Amino acid sequence: EDLPEK
């Protein structure tokens, strides 16, 4: 699962 960079 890919989480967006914040």
From Swiss-Prot:
It comes from the Eukaryota. GO terms for cellular component: extracellular region. Keywords: Cell wall, Secreted. It is found in: Secreted, Cell wall. This is 36 kDa cell wall protein. It comes from Arabidopsis thaliana (Mouse-ear cress). The lineage of its organism: Eukaryota, Viridiplantae, Streptophyta, Embryophyta, Tracheophyta.
